[in-house]
From Swiss-Prot:
Species this chain originates from: Streptococcus gordonii (strain Challis / ATCC 35105 / BCRC 15272 / CH1 / DL1 / V288)
Keywords tagged on the record: Cytoplasm, Hydrolase, Nuclease, Ribosome biogenesis
Protein name per UniProt: Putative pre-16S rRNA nuclease
Enzyme Commission designation: 3.1.-.-
Localisation per UniProt entry: Cytoplasm
Signal peptide: none
Length: 139
Protein backbone atom coordinates (compact mmCIF):
# COMPACT_ATOMS: atom_id res chain seq x y z
CA UNK A 1 0.00 0.00 0.00
CA UNK A 2 1.48 3.32 -1.08
CA UNK A 3 0.60 6.35 1.01
CA UNK A 4 1.30 9.92 -0.07
CA UNK A 5 2.05 12.54 2.57
CA UNK A 6 1.26 16.20 1.94
CA UNK A 7 2.38 19.33 3.77
CA UNK A 8 -0.05 21.96 2.49
CA UNK A 9 1.03 25.58 2.70
CA UNK A 10 -0.24 28.76 1.11
CA UNK A 11 2.45 28.77 -1.60
CA UNK A 12 3.68 25.19 -1.77
CA UNK A 13 2.68 21.59 -1.13
CA UNK A 14 5.45 19.31 0.09
CA UNK A 15 5.01 15.75 -1.18
CA UNK A 16 6.34 12.50 0.27
CA UNK A 17 5.66 8.84 -0.53
CA UNK A 18 5.85 5.66 1.51
CA UNK A 19 7.64 2.53 0.40
CA UNK A 20 5.22 -0.23 -0.78
CA UNK A 21 5.30 -1.93 2.64
CA UNK A 22 4.55 1.26 4.57
CA UNK A 23 7.74 1.31 6.65
CA UNK A 24 9.53 4.43 5.43
CA UNK A 25 8.66 7.80 3.95
CA UNK A 26 10.73 9.59 1.33
CA UNK A 27 10.40 13.19 0.22
CA UNK A 28 9.46 13.54 -3.44
CA UNK A 29 9.08 17.16 -4.43
CA UNK A 30 7.54 20.53 -3.73
CA UNK A 31 4.59 21.63 -5.85
CA UNK A 32 4.16 25.38 -6.27
CA UNK A 33 0.60 26.60 -5.66
CA UNK A 34 -1.16 29.96 -5.59
CA UNK A 35 -4.24 30.12 -3.36
CA UNK A 36 -5.19 33.61 -4.57
CA UNK A 37 -5.41 32.40 -8.19
CA UNK A 38 -6.91 29.05 -7.15
CA UNK A 39 -3.96 27.08 -8.53
CA UNK A 40 -3.53 24.10 -6.24
CA UNK A 41 -1.21 21.78 -8.16
CA UNK A 42 -3.78 19.01 -8.57
CA UNK A 43 -2.61 18.18 -12.11
CA UNK A 44 0.93 17.43 -10.92
CA UNK A 45 -0.43 15.63 -7.87
CA UNK A 46 -2.49 13.43 -10.21
CA UNK A 47 0.63 12.53 -12.18
CA UNK A 48 2.39 11.47 -8.97
CA UNK A 49 -0.66 9.50 -7.79
CA UNK A 50 -0.65 7.54 -11.05
CA UNK A 51 3.13 7.08 -11.12
CA UNK A 52 3.32 5.74 -7.57
CA UNK A 53 -0.07 3.97 -7.55
CA UNK A 54 -1.14 5.78 -4.39
CA UNK A 55 -3.82 4.16 -2.20
CA UNK A 56 -4.25 6.84 0.47
CA UNK A 57 -3.25 10.38 1.43
CA UNK A 58 -2.02 11.69 4.77
CA UNK A 59 -2.24 15.45 5.11
CA UNK A 60 -0.57 17.43 7.87
CA UNK A 61 -2.96 19.21 10.20
CA UNK A 62 -1.33 22.38 11.58
CA UNK A 63 -2.74 22.49 15.10
CA UNK A 64 -1.65 24.97 17.75
CA UNK A 65 0.49 23.77 20.65
CA UNK A 66 -2.58 23.79 22.94
CA UNK A 67 -4.32 21.36 20.51
CA UNK A 68 -6.72 23.97 19.10
CA UNK A 69 -7.10 24.43 15.37
CA UNK A 70 -4.48 26.69 13.85
CA UNK A 71 -5.24 29.20 11.10
CA UNK A 72 -4.29 26.74 8.35
CA UNK A 73 -6.38 23.79 9.58
CA UNK A 74 -9.41 24.73 7.45
CA UNK A 75 -7.22 25.20 4.38
CA UNK A 76 -5.63 21.78 4.89
CA UNK A 77 -9.03 20.15 5.37
CA UNK A 78 -10.41 21.88 2.26
CA UNK A 79 -7.40 20.64 0.29
CA UNK A 80 -8.04 17.13 1.63
CA UNK A 81 -11.70 17.28 0.61
CA UNK A 82 -10.72 18.30 -2.92
CA UNK A 83 -8.11 15.52 -3.09
CA UNK A 84 -10.79 12.97 -2.11
CA UNK A 85 -13.18 14.41 -4.69
CA UNK A 86 -10.60 14.39 -7.50
CA UNK A 87 -8.86 11.09 -6.86
CA UNK A 88 -11.47 9.05 -5.00
CA UNK A 89 -8.92 8.03 -2.38
CA UNK A 90 -9.17 8.19 1.40
CA UNK A 91 -7.51 11.05 3.27
CA UNK A 92 -6.33 10.91 6.86
CA UNK A 93 -4.91 13.79 8.85
CA UNK A 94 -1.74 13.75 10.92
CA UNK A 95 -0.88 16.29 13.60
CA UNK A 96 2.01 18.23 12.12
CA UNK A 97 2.95 20.37 15.10
CA UNK A 98 6.65 21.17 15.02
CA UNK A 99 7.38 19.16 11.85
CA UNK A 100 8.63 22.22 9.96
CA UNK A 101 10.70 23.22 13.00
CA UNK A 102 12.13 19.68 13.19
CA UNK A 103 12.82 19.68 9.45
CA UNK A 104 14.66 23.00 9.66
CA UNK A 105 16.67 21.82 12.65
CA UNK A 106 17.67 18.66 10.76
CA UNK A 107 18.81 20.70 7.78
CA UNK A 108 20.85 23.06 9.95
CA UNK A 109 22.38 20.63 12.44
CA UNK A 110 22.82 17.49 10.37
CA UNK A 111 23.31 18.80 6.87
CA UNK A 112 24.60 22.36 7.44
CA UNK A 113 22.30 23.59 4.67
CA UNK A 114 22.22 27.32 3.88
CA UNK A 115 19.04 29.36 4.36
CA UNK A 116 18.38 29.61 0.60
CA UNK A 117 18.74 25.87 0.10
CA UNK A 118 16.58 25.14 3.16
CA UNK A 119 13.70 27.10 1.63
CA UNK A 120 13.87 24.85 -1.43
CA UNK A 121 13.55 21.57 0.48
CA UNK A 122 11.88 22.35 3.83
CA UNK A 123 8.30 21.54 2.75
CA UNK A 124 9.35 18.25 1.16
CA UNK A 125 11.15 17.24 4.34
CA UNK A 126 8.16 18.34 6.46
CA UNK A 127 5.88 16.14 4.30
CA UNK A 128 8.30 13.27 4.84
CA UNK A 129 8.21 13.76 8.62
CA UNK A 130 4.40 13.99 8.64
CA UNK A 131 4.14 10.74 6.70
CA UNK A 132 6.81 8.97 8.75
CA UNK A 133 5.06 9.95 11.98
CA UNK A 134 1.82 8.53 10.57
CA UNK A 135 3.51 5.28 9.48
CA UNK A 136 5.22 4.87 12.85
CA UNK A 137 1.91 5.36 14.64
CA UNK A 138 -0.21 3.12 12.43
CA UNK A 139 1.94 0.35 10.94
Amino acid sequence: MRIMGLDVGSKTVGVAISDPLGFTAQGLEIIQINEDQEEFGFERLGELVAEYKVDKFVIGLPKNMNNTSGPRVEASQAYGAKVTELFGLPVEYQDERLTTVAAERMLIEQADVSRNKRKKVIDKLAAQLILQNYLDRNY
